[in-house]
Regions:
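GST-like domain detector, emphasizing the conserved glutathione-binding G-site
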Residues: 1-153, 158
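Residues at alpha-helix termini
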Residues: 13, 142, 170, 195-196
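Hydrophobic/aromatic-lined pockets within catalytic cores
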Residues: 100-104, 128, 168, 188-189, ...
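Solvent-exposed, charged/polar functional surfaces in cytosolic regulatory/catalytic domains
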Residues: 158, 162-166
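Surface-exposed helix-capping loop/turn segments at secondary-structure junctions
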Residues: 105, 165-177
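GST superfamily/GST-like fold recognition
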Residues: 173-198
Length: 198
């Protein structure tokens, strides 16, 4: 669902977007680079120099080229590249912003109104705070503590109360028209609901 943010924005904004990826369980079966590609077990033995062992958020190994990690120093996905220079962009909301800037429909990211753009950014940042709490919850799900449960519950309630307050004053989250703040929320909430079933 996090990559959906950029896909939906590109569709609404009238631009083409190339997305390469796979399901989380298949991530170790790819060589991550600007031109990411699937790899076989045989390939993996030849790509040992690109192997990155699990640190957090996944188990096993992933394979990422030096060029990938230069552009994405945290080594996370989703990961985007933009421009002829193939500049690396990481974090789903940053990729979302980059896509929105390229869209024909500039209103998705506030248009010429820099104050609205800043307001949209505020909601995107609040989104990430909630997402971070939820990710910790998911990673501990098999051995959840009462502390983590209560912290996630409080973050969820705080986040939704803020959105409800905003929506009581306007038709959309950041104002009176659809923006990437709405798209980001819908995708993050879909992730939350989806993961809640497992």
């Amino acid at each position: 669902p996090r990559v959906w943010k950029s896909i939906i924005t590109a569709k609404i904004g009238g631009i083409d977007l190339e997305v390469i990826g796979d399901k989380p369980n298949n991530m170790p079966n790819w060589l991550w680079d600007f031109d990411a590609k699937p790899i076989s077990e045989e390939d993996k033995s030849e790509l040992k120099s690109f192997e990155i062992k699990s640190k957090r958020g996944f188990k096993g190994s992933l394979y990422k080229t030096d060029k990938f990690t230069e552009q994405h120093p945290f080594g996370t996905v989703p990961a985007g590249f933009i421009g002829n220079e193939r500049v690396g962009i990481f974090e789903s909301n940053s990729i979302l912003r980059a896509v929105a800037r390229e869209c024909k429909d500039k209103s998705l990211y506030g248009g010429e109104d820099i104050n609205l753009t800043s307001r949209i950014d505020s909601f995107l940042d609040a989104n990430l705070v909630f997402s971070r709490e939820f990710q910790v919850y998911l990673l501990e799900l098999e051995d959840i503590t009462q502390y983590t449960y209560e912290r996630t519950k409080a973050a969820y309630e705080f986040y939704l109360e803020g959105l409800e307050k905003s929506l009581s004053l306007s038709s959309f989250i950041a104002g009176d028209q659809l923006t990437i703040a709405d798209i980001s929320f819908a995708c993050e909430f879909a992730q939350f609901l989806r993961e809640g079933h497992y």
